[in-house]
Amino acid sequence: MDILFVLSAVPHTSPWSTQVAMVMITCNLLAIVAGRYAIKVRGLGPSIPVSGVEGFGLPELLATTSLGHVIGAASILGLSNVGLIS
């Protein structure tokens, strides 16, 4: 397979910038807030050493930030294709 063909199929993405970082941080925070209230069975794994988050442990944090990164990557690709972030 020709490498130029593969490279032509990859969409143009914006380089890392403050705008890209803010989109990713916002998506992760929204996923954490949504997961805090949406996860029914909580507190089964190890806890995180942050006060005020009883019942929200390491498994919940990893799950919500994983979802936040998926949403953030899709948002960054979409916003850069539309031209709202550069």
Swiss-Prot record:
The keyword Membrane applies. Keywords: Chloroplast, Membrane, Photosynthesis, Photosystem I, Plastid, Thylakoid, Transmembrane, Transmembrane helix. It is a multi-pass membrane protein. GO terms for cellular component: chloroplast thylakoid membrane; photosystem I. The keyword Transmembrane applies. It is found in: Plastid, Chloroplast thylakoid membrane. One of its GO terms (biological process) is photosynthesis. Coiled coil: none annotated. The chain crosses the membrane at residues 20-39, 61-79. Belongs to the PsaG/PsaK family. This is Photosystem I reaction center subunit PsaK. It comes from Porphyra purpurea (Red seaweed).
